[in-house]
Amino acid sequence: MASEGITEIDSGLIESNYDNVVYKFDDLNLKPNIVRGIFGYGYETPSAIQQRAILPITEGRDVLAQAQSGTGKTATFTISALQRIDENEKSTQALILAPTRELALQIKNVITSIGLYLNVTVHASIGGTSMSDDIEAFKSGVQIVVGTPGRVFDMIERRYFRTDKVKMFILDEADEMLSSGFKEQIYNIFRLLPETTQVVLLSATMPQDVLEVTTKFMNNPVRILVKKDELTLEGIKQYFINVEVEDYKFDCLVDLYDSISVTQAVIFCNTRSKVEFLTNKLREQKFTVSAIHADLPQGERDTIMKEFRSGSSRILISTDLLARGIDVQQVSLVINYDLPANKENYIHRIGRGGRFGRKGVAINFVTDKDVGMMREIEKFYSTQITEMPADIGSLFA
């Protein structure tokens, strides 16, 4: 089924060296109880990435899959892992790594939901939680482990997590996972897995340095790559407001909120101190605001996310911690109070706004100093960020 080079599929929107595209879940040769779980989770037909990636993963092939946020890539490897798990073997068979605790917990929840009718155990091994709970889970036997690199490596090194039966190693958000901050930890974990372990990498962006690193991990991988000019999510309208200087941003934000009616919004800042500053200023103006950043205790972060999901908080202010994988369905507006320092995080941020075709708006506050960075982002994604129109209220009508 694999052909020699990269061939274009689906009017050139997706490139792949694997030519088997499956358009129905019923045709993927999945366990009946997985199909039952898929339909129960709300899927009716596979998304583009699911049509192309599930089959080679379930066949045991190494897969490098690129799909933007909101296309169902988490379910892609969830379905595949559940298919490959031997329910009678109680050892850990699949290891899934994610860059943040929040994303790891979200993945665990998706696995639990889709695997509802299977006899499969899943555990989140993440920093900021009880070490004793982790140890107990590994001692009792867990078949799928979702975790963050630091805690997972610690559990392996302490010999609570036995890796001899691991047959799948999945890295979600690979561009982040293989960045300088995680690369060494990933390598350390990889060296402790069986040589025959299948490797699956999924991400929204695949910079060249990441593609080069995959040669160290993977054996003749199936490549499913979205063309760079297709990375921006459909349904997300992108605008900028030229605020000239940093000091004008806050007044601009308040004016913006006076002009529009939005159910919920996420506002991104680049630093914890900026998040705290903006949160306090908005509360002084009587806005209902929540804030989240990496330095908050895990329990507090969970509570904040729960409140925002329930709708009791209308505005969530965050660092890039939230940009990777938190699924908040009601969000129609994302505001980049600061443009991301790393242009590859831009798509993760604006991807909060319109998942699975839901319409969304992204508004970027741009100082005179930021114009160059905004042009770089446009070039990187082959997209256009247009100036905010005068009648902005019509965008949210």
Curated annotation (Swiss-Prot):
<dbReference type="GO" id="GO:0003743">
    <property type="term" value="F:translation initiation factor activity"/>
</dbReference>
<dbReference type="InterPro" id="IPR001650">
    <property type="entry name" value="Helicase_C-like"/>
</dbReference>
<keyword id="KW-0547">Nucleotide-binding</keyword>
<dbReference type="GO" id="GO:0003724">
    <property type="term" value="F:RNA helicase activity"/>
</dbReference>
<comment type="function">
    <text>ATP-dependent RNA helicase which is a subunit of the eIF4F complex involved in cap recognition and is required for mRNA binding to ribosome. In the current model of translation initiation, eIF4A unwinds RNA secondary structures in the 5'-UTR of mRNAs which is necessary to allow efficient binding of the small ribosomal subunit, and subsequent scanning for the initiator codon.</text>
</comment>
<dbReference type="GO" id="GO:0016887">
    <property type="term" value="F:ATP hydrolysis activity"/>
</dbReference>
<keyword id="KW-0963">Cytoplasm</keyword>
<dbReference type="GO" id="GO:0005524">
    <property type="term" value="F:ATP binding"/>
</dbReference>
<keyword id="KW-0378">Hydrolase</keyword>
<dbReference type="InterPro" id="IPR014001">
    <property type="entry name" value="Helicase_ATP-bd"/>
</dbReference>
<feature type="domain" description="Helicase ATP-binding">
    <location>
        <begin position="54"/>
        <end position="224"/>
    </location>
</feature>
<feature type="domain" description="Helicase C-terminal">
    <location>
        <begin position="255"/>
        <end position="396"/>
    </location>
</feature>
<dbReference type="InterPro" id="IPR014014">
    <property type="entry name" value="RNA_helicase_DEAD_Q_motif"/>
</dbReference>
<dbReference type="InterPro" id="IPR011545">
    <property type="entry name" value="DEAD/DEAH_box_helicase_dom"/>
</dbReference>
<keyword id="KW-0067">ATP-binding</keyword>
<dbReference type="GO" id="GO:0005737">
    <property type="term" value="C:cytoplasm"/>
</dbReference>
<keyword id="KW-0396">Initiation factor</keyword>
<feature type="short sequence motif" description="DEAD box">
    <location>
        <begin position="172"/>
        <end position="175"/>
    </location>
</feature>
<dbReference type="Pfam" id="PF00270">
    <property type="entry name" value="DEAD"/>
</dbReference>
<dbReference type="InterPro" id="IPR027417">
    <property type="entry name" value="P-loop_NTPase"/>
</dbReference>
<keyword id="KW-0648">Protein biosynthesis</keyword>
<dbReference type="GO" id="GO:0003723">
    <property type="term" value="F:RNA binding"/>
</dbReference>
<dbReference type="InterPro" id="IPR000629">
    <property type="entry name" value="RNA-helicase_DEAD-box_CS"/>
</dbReference>
<protein>
    <recommendedName>
        <fullName>ATP-dependent RNA helicase eIF4A</fullName>
        <ecNumber>3.6.4.13</ecNumber>
    </recommendedName>
</protein>
<keyword id="KW-0347">Helicase</keyword>
<keyword id="KW-0694">RNA-binding</keyword>
<feature type="short sequence motif" description="Q motif">
    <location>
        <begin position="23"/>
        <end position="51"/>
    </location>
</feature>
<feature type="binding site">
    <location>
        <begin position="67"/>
        <end position="74"/>
    </location>
    <ligand>
        <name>ATP</name>
    </ligand>
</feature>
<comment type="similarity">
    <text>Belongs to the DEAD box helicase family. eIF4A subfamily.</text>
</comment>
<dbReference type="Pfam" id="PF00271">
    <property type="entry name" value="Helicase_C"/>
</dbReference>
<comment type="subunit">
    <text>Component of the eIF4F complex, which composition varies with external and internal environmental conditions. It is composed of at least eIF4A, eIF4E and eIF4G.</text>
</comment>
